Swiss-Prot record:
Gene: CVC2
Protein name, per record: Capsid vertex component 2
Family: Belongs to the herpesviridae CVC2 protein family.
One GO process term, biological-process aspect: symbiont entry into host cell
Cellular component terms per the entry's GO annotation: host cell; host cell nucleus; viral capsid
Domain of life of the source: Viruses
Signal peptide (UniProt feature, chain positions): none
Length: 543
C-alpha cells in the first residue's frame, strides 16, 4: 500500500493573502506515490483469485450434480433389483410347488381322425390376407401392408434400389439438406437416387396416421367407424334396409351404400362446398370443439355439402319440439355396435366432424375407382410387381382375371371385399389415412398444386414442412405439446386438401393428374395401388 502523508493536519500551512483573499498553498511533503508495476501485479493477483473462486464454485456444483445423478441411479438400481428379487422369489416358490406335487406320466396321444389330420392348424392368428387388384396374388400381412411391402424391396441393394417418383425424390433431397433432421434417417441410399428404408417407414407412418386421434376417451370412435355408421344410417333411411347390428354388417355391400351416397351428393344443391366455417378460436387450435365443449359453433357445419345432404335427408334432425320425433338411426347403430358410451353425434360433434372428413376420403376413393378398367398387361404401367417381388409374385386364377370390361363400381367392390374388409376386421380402429394413404397424399399435394394445367414448378419445401416437423418431434426433440401441434397442423392440411379436390370441376381428373405428375402413375392399375400403398416403387439400377 502506498503511504499518503498529510503533514498539513499536524501543522497549519501558511496562508497567502492577495487583495484580501486567502489562498492555501500545498505542503511539499503531501505526495502520493503510485507504482505501475505494483498496480499491475495487484490486478493480476485479483484476477487469479477471482478465477480460482469461480473454479471452486463450478467444481462444487458439478460434484453436487454428480452426487444427485449417482443417487438417482442408485435408487433406480435398488428399485430394479427389488423387482428382480421379488420375481426370483416367486419363481422359486413355483418351482418348489412343482417339485412337491406328484409327477404325472404323460398319456400317449390319441390317434387323429383323417378329417382332423387333413386340416392344418394356423397358429398365426394375427396374420390376415388381402388382395388389391383383380388378378393379382394375395398378400399375407401382419399389421401394415405398405410398410411390409416396402421393406421387402431392399433385399437386392447391390443390383437395384427402389425409386418412388418425383414427390419422394424431392422430399428426400430437401430432407438431406435440412440442418435439423434425425441422424438415424440420413442413410446412404438417400444420396443414390433412392430413399432409405428408415426414411420411407417414417414418412409412410406419418402419412398413415394423419387422421388418427392422438387423444380420445370412451365417447370417441375412429373416423373410419364414424364414416361407416353415417353411410349405413343414410342407406337404411333411404332404402328401409334393416339396421346393422354387428361390425361386419357395416362393411357388407359397402359399394352399394357408398355409390348411392355419391349419386345423391352429386345431385344435391345445398351447401357451398366441402369446408367447415369455424370461428376464430376454432380455426387452427385443435380439432376438438373449443372450451372443452361437445359442440362446435352454431354455423360450423352450415356450408359443408355432406352435412347439408345428411340434414336434408332427416338423418341429423335435432329439433326437440317435434310432436313425433324421428328415431336417431346413427345413435341406434353406434349403441348397438360400439356400446352405450357413444353419445349421439348431434350432441357430441367430434365424431360427426371426423366422420364427414372420412366420408370425403371414401368418396374420392370411390370416384377414382368408379370406372376403373384393370388390364392384365400395360406398356405404360409404372408399377411392376413381378420385377419388384420376383418369383414370389404369381398371377391369380380368379374369374376376374380374364374379364375385359368392369362394371361401374366393380373395382371398388373388389377392393372392399379383399382389402377394406380384411383390414378393418383385423383392426377396427385404423383411421382412413391408414386405409388410403394415397388419398391423404393427393389431398396434401393438391394444396401445392392448385392448378395442374399451369406449367409451374414448385421448388419450395414448404409442402413437406409438417411431415418433417412430426418426424423431428418423434426422433429428435420428443416434445409432446409440439408433436400434438404438428399433427393437428397436418390434419388441418388434409381437411383443406380434401375440400380442394372435391370442389374442383372434375375431382377425378384433378386427382389422377396429381398421381401422374408427382408419383408416376399411368393407368388405373397404378391408381389402385397408389391409393392403398401411398407410393409406386420401381426398380432403379444401383449406382
Amino acid at each position: 500500500m502506498w503511504k499518503l502523508e498529510k503533514k498539513y493536519i499536524l501543522r497549519q500551512n501558511p496562508s497567502v493573502f492577495l487583495n484580501g483573499t486567502a489562498f492555501w498553498t500545498p505542503h511539499p511533503q503531501n505526495i502520493l506515490h503510485i507504482d505501475r508495476n505494483s498496480l499491475r501485479e495487484t490486478k493480476k493477483n485479483a484476477s487469479l483469485y477471482r478465477t480460482r473462486l469461480l473454479n471452486l464454485e463450478t467444481e462444487q456444483i458439478k460434484k453436487a450434480m454428480i452426487n444427485y445423478e449417482l443417487d438417482k441411479l442408485m435408487q433406480d438400481h435398488v428399485k430394479r433389483s427389488s423387482i428382480i428379487t421379488r420375481d426370483l422369489e416367486i419363481i422359486e416358490n413355483m418351482v418348489e410347488k412343482f417339485q412337491d406335487s406328484p409327477q404325472l406320466l404323460p398319456s400317449p396321444p390319441k390317434p387323429l381322425s383323417p378329417t382332423t389330420q387333413s386340416q392344418p392348424t394356423n397358429f398365426k392368428t394375427n396374420v390376415y390376407t388381402i388382395t388389391v387388384a383383380p388378378g393379382d396374388p394375395g398378400f399375407t400381412v401382419e399389421s401394415n401392408f405398405k410398410i411390409e411391402l416396402v421393406s421387402s424391396l431392399y433385399t437386392n441393394q447391390q443390383q437395384w434400389l427402389p425409386s418412388y417418383g418425383p414427390w419422394y425424390s424431392s422430399l428426400t433431397d430437401i430432407a438431406m439438406q435440412r440442418r435439423v433432421f434425425p441422424k438415424e434417417l440420413r442413410g446412404t441410399l438417400n444420396y443414390q437416387n433412392s430413399t432409405s428404408l428408415k426414411l420411407m417407414h417414417a414418412v409412410l407412418t406419418t402419412i398413415s396416421s394423419a387422421t388418427d386421434d392422438f387423444y380420445s376417451d370412451v365417447r370417441h370412435i375412429s373416423d373410419t367407424s364414424s364414416a361407416l355408421v353415417i353411410l349405413n344410417a343414410y342407406f337404411c333411411l333411404k332404402t328401409s334396409a334393416p339396421i346393422p347390428v354387428t361390425y361386419e354388417e357395416l362393411l357388407n355391400n359397402l359399394e352399394a351404400k357408398l355409390g348411392m351416397f355419391v349419386f345423391d351428393l352429386k345431385n344435391h344443391t345445398g351447401g357451398n362446398g366441402f369446408s367447415f366455417s369455424p370461428q376464430v378460436n376454432e380455426a387452427t387450435s385443435s380439432i376438438a370443439p373449443p372450451n372443452k365443449d361437445t359442440k362446435y359453433s352454431q354455423h360450423f357445419f352450415s356450408s359443408h355439402k355432406i352435412y347439408s345432404l345428411l340434414e336434408a335427408s332427416g338423418l341429423l334432425s335435432t329439433k326437440s319440439h317435434e310432436i313425433n320425433p324421428k328415431t336417431d338411426v346413427i345413435y341406434t347403430i353406434t349403441t348397438e355396435i360400439f356400446g352405450e358410451d357413444i353419445p349421439p353425434m348431434a350432441s357430441f360433434q367430434w365424431n360427426l366432424r371426423v366422420g364427414i372428413i372420412a366420408i370425403e376420403v371414401f368418396v374420392i376413393t370411390y370416384l377414382l375407382l368408379e370406372t376403373s378398367q384393370i388390364s392384365i398387361h400395360s406398356t405404360h404401367r409404372r408399377l411392376n410387381l413381378s420385377t419388384l417381388l420376383g418369383s414370389k409374385f404369381k398371377k391369380s386364377s380368379t374369374g376376374l382375371l380374364n374379364q375385359i370390361v368392369y362394371k361401374k363400381g366393380q373395382v371398388f367392390s373388389f377392393l372392399n371385399k379383399n382389402y377394406i374388409v380384411p383390414t378393418l376386421t383385423h383392426n377396427k380402429n385404423v383411421p382412413t389415412s391408414f386405409l388410403f394413404p394415397g388419398v391423404t397424399l393427393i389431398a396434401l399435394e393438391s394444396l401445392a398444386t392448385t392448378a395442374v394445367d399451369k406449367p409451374f414448378i414448385n421448388l419450395t419445401g414448404n409442402r413437406f414442412q409438417d411431415i418433417f416437423e412430426i418426424i423431428n418431434q418423434k426422433f429428435t426433440f420428443k416434445d409432446p405439446v409440439s408433436l400434438m401441434a404438428a399433427q393437428t397442423a397436418l390434419r388441418f392440411k388434409v381437411e383443406h386438401g380434401l375440400s380442394n379436390i372435391l370442389t374442383n370441376l372434375s375431382p377425378t381428373t384433378f386427382a389422377t393428374e396429381i398421381i401422374r405428375r408427382q408419383f408416376g402413375g399411368e393407368d388405373d392399375y397404378d391408381t389402385l395401388y397408389f391409393i392403398v400403398l401411398g407410393c409406386l416403387p420401381i426398380a432403379w439400377a444401383a449406382v
